[in-house]
């Protein structure tokens, strides 16, 4: 749980073994894939995001879950604050390359219901371009999608006090309108130039499953 992450015994152990930063697997609100749910299983890895601003409720203590969204947020903030007090940075693994809604036959949970044609990369016939292997890819040729990610990063940096990010399948985040990787992509430039983000630690997973994916 978030509370356990900042428990004195946890922090004491991290300090004892010389840890100066922790990287958390994705903690954005997520759902399990339908085929896992049918088997009674759960996506423990977390790479199936439906919202980039809310922390996943199931990682909070039962008490916080019972008390509601603000209690979950406060529990996570407390954990980050206590780690910082111990001199330990907090880095988040973030999954901005796709959402949990899957391919064309997937369910509608979030951004697909808001505006599928703008949020997801598609061809002229409306078929999804999938460079993530997860059924869909967010359309970073659309400035609104770039704004979404920048706003999310600012929120987690300024409000939640996160120190850095590891970008899952980062090549997808810098594909232009022709689906080609662009090292000068607007998202990359805005991260570097942003007052809130320019000093954060940034780690990129340098590939996706599209053409020219390894970067």
Residue ranges and their predicted role:
Residues 2-161, 166-193:
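Substrate-binding/active-site clefts of carbohydrate-active enzymes
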